[in-house]
Swiss-Prot record:
Cellular component aspect of the GO annotation: extracellular region; plasma membrane
Gene name linked to the record: Tmprss11e
GO biological process, one term: symbiont entry into host cell
Glycosylation sites: N74, N165, N182, N223
TM regions (residue ranges): 19-39
Classification via SUPFAM superfamilies: SEA domain, Trypsin-like serine proteases
Enzyme Commission designation: 3.4.21.-
Protein name as catalogued: Transmembrane protease serine 11E
Protein species of origin: Mus musculus (Mouse)
Length: 423
C-alpha cells in the first residue's frame, strides 16, 4: 500500500525590524573584533631585520699567525667556536630564537690579544623599540659571555656593537669568500645534464670565459682580479686580448663583463694528457664584490675530502653529450669518490693521478658536460662557507655508468696558485 504524501502549507513568519537591527549590530561587532585581532596578530608577529657589526677581544693558546688567514682550517675552527659562544649567549636570553646569524668576517691582531670582527643578524618583532633592542643585545653579550667556556677566552667587557643597514651588511658578507646570499635551490638534486636553471646570486663565483664573445669554458673567481680554470681551455686560443669573462646566472643578458689581462697555464700541462689541467686568468680590472659576484674560498693544501662528501658542480654546458651550450647556469649535486674506487678497471683503470679527483655517481646520470670545462666543483664546511674543491677537467662522455666526472684537484695546486697570485 502506498502512503499518500501530505502537503501542508507553511506559515510565513515575519521578523521584527528591531531584531534584524540587533543581529546586524552584533555581526558588525564580531567582524570588527576579527579584523582587530588579525591586524594585531600581523603587527605583533611581523618581524624586522636588525644588522649589527660587532667586535670583541679574546686570547687563545694558538698564535695569531695560525688562524688569522681567512678560509684556513684554523680560521674556520676559531670562527666556529666564537660564533657558537655568541649563539649560546642569546639562546638563554629575551632574544632567544631571534638571532638569525652570527658570522666572523675577520680577525685582527692587538697588543694584548686578538680582535674578532663579526656580523650579527636578528629578526625581531616590529613592535619592539629599536633602542631597547640595542640595549638588550649589548646586555646579553656583556653578561652572558662571562660564562662562556673557552678556548678561546673572550673578554665580555670589550664587546662593541654598531647598528648597520642592509647594504653595509651585504658589503661585509660579500667581501668574505665562499658566502652565498641566495640558496633557494641548494637542497634540490638537479643535473647540468637535463637539469633546471639556478637563480641569480646562487653561485656568485661562477664565470663564463669567452673567446671573441662566445662561451668556451667556465671559471671560478678566487679574488677580485683572478680566475681559476682548466688549462685545456687555452690549448688553441692563447691571446688574452680576445678573451673576456662574464658573470651572472645567464650568458645573455650579462651581469658583468671584463677583459683578460694575462693567462698562466701550468708549465707541466701537455696535451693530450689531462694531468696538470689548471690555469689562471688575470682580469683586466678588479670586479666589484656584490651579492651576484664575489669570490669562493680556497682550501688548505693539506685538506682531505671524505668519500661520499656532498659537492656541487655548476656550468653553462650541454645537457647531453655533444649537446649545445645553455644560456642559463645549471647545478648538479655530486658525491666525492675516492681515487682508489675511481681507478678501478671498470671505471678509469688507473688514469686518475694524485692531481685529479672524481665526483659523481657510479650509476651515472648526474655529471658535468661539454662547455662546463674549467668551472667550479665546490663543497661547504660546517659554517656553510663554500670552497673550491675541483676544476671541471675531463670524463668519458657525460653521465655514463662507472664514469664519474674527473676534476683537477685544487689542493694539489694550492701552492702553485699562491705563488702566481699571492692568494
Amino acid at each position: 500500500m502506498y502512503r499518500s504524501c501530505v502537503v501542508r502549507a507553511r506559515k510565513r513568519t515575519c521578523v521584527e525590524p528591531w531584531v534584524i537591527g540587533i543581529i546586524s549590530f552584533l555581526s558588525l561587532i564580531v567582524l570588527a573584533v576579527c579584523i582587530g585581532l588579525t591586524v594585531h596578530y600581523v603587527r605583533y608577529n611581523h618581524r624586522r631585520t636588525y644588522n649589527y657589526y660587532s667586535t670583541l677581544s679574546f686570547t687563545s693558546d694558538k698564535l695569531y699567525s695560525e688562524f688569522g688567514r681567512e678560509a684556513s682550517k684554523n680560521f674556520t675552527e676559531m670562527s666556529q667556536r666564537i660564533e657558537t659562544m655568541v649563539k649560546h649567549a642569546f639562546h638563554k636570553s629575551p632574544l632567544r630564537g631571534q638571532l638569525v646569524k652570527a658570522h666572523i668576517i675577520k680577525f685582527s691582531k692587538e697588543d694584548d690579544g686578538v680582535l674578532a670582527h663579526m656580523l650579527l643578524i636578528f629578526r625581531i618583532r616590529s613592535t619592539e623599540d629599536p633602542e631597547t633592542v640595542h640595549k638588550i643585545i649589548e646586555y646579553v653579550l656583556h653578561e652572558k659571555l662571562k660564562y662562556a667556556t673557552g678556548p678561546p677566552n673572550v673578554d665580555p667587557e670589550s664587546v662593541k656593537i654598531k647598528k648597520i643597514n642592509k647594504t653595509e651588511s651585504d658589503n661585509y658578507f660579500n667581501h668574505c669568500c665562499g658566502t652565498r646570499r641566495n640558496k633557494s635551490t641548494v637542497q634540490t638534486s638537479v643535473r647540468i645534464v637535463g637539469g633546471t636553471p639556478v637563480e641569480e646570486e646562487e653561485w656568485p663565483w661562477q664565470s663564463s670565459l669567452r673567446w671573441d664573445g662566445s662561451h668556451r669554458c667556465g671559471a671560478t673567481l678566487i679574488n677580485n682580479t683572478w680566475l681559476v680554470t682548466a688549462a685545456h681551455c687555452f690549448r688553441t686560443h692563447k691571446d688574452p686580448s680576445r678573451w673576456s669573462a662574464t658573470f651572472g646566472a645567464t650568458l645573455q643578458p650579462r651581469k658583468l663583463t671584463t677583459g683578460i689581462r694575462r693567462i698562466i697555464v701550468h708549465e707541466k700541462y701537455k696535451y693530450p694528457s689531462h694531468d696538470y689541467d689548471i690555469a689562471l686568468a688575470e682580469l683586466s680590472k678588479p670586479v666589484p664584490c656584490t651579492n651576484a659576484v664575489h669570490k669562493v674560498c680556497l682550501p688548505d693544501a693539506n685538506h682531505e675530502f671524505q668519500p661520499g662528501q656532498r659537492m656541487f658542480v655548476t656550468g653553462f654546458g650541454a645537457l647531453k653529450n655533444d649537446g649545445f651550450t645553455q644560456n642559463n647556469l645549471r647545478q648538479v649535486q655530486v658525491d666525492y669518490i675516492d681515487t682508489q674506487t675511481c681507478n678501478q678497471p671498470q671505471s678509469y683503470n688507473g688514469a686518475i693521478t694524485p692531481r685529479m679527483l672524481c665526483a659523481g655517481f657510479l650509476k651515472g646520470e648526474k655529471d658535468a658536460c661539454q662547455g662546463d670545462s674549467g668551472g667550479p666543483l665546490v663543497t661547504a664546511d660546517v659554517r656553510d662557507i663554500w670552497y673550491l674543491a675541483g676544476v671541471v677537467s675531463w670524463g668519458d662522455e657525460c653521465g655514463q655508468p662507472n664514469k664519474p666526472g674527473v676534476y683537477t684537484r685544487v689542493t694539489a695546486f694550492r701552492h702553485w696558485i699562491a705563488s702566481n697570485t699571492g692568494i
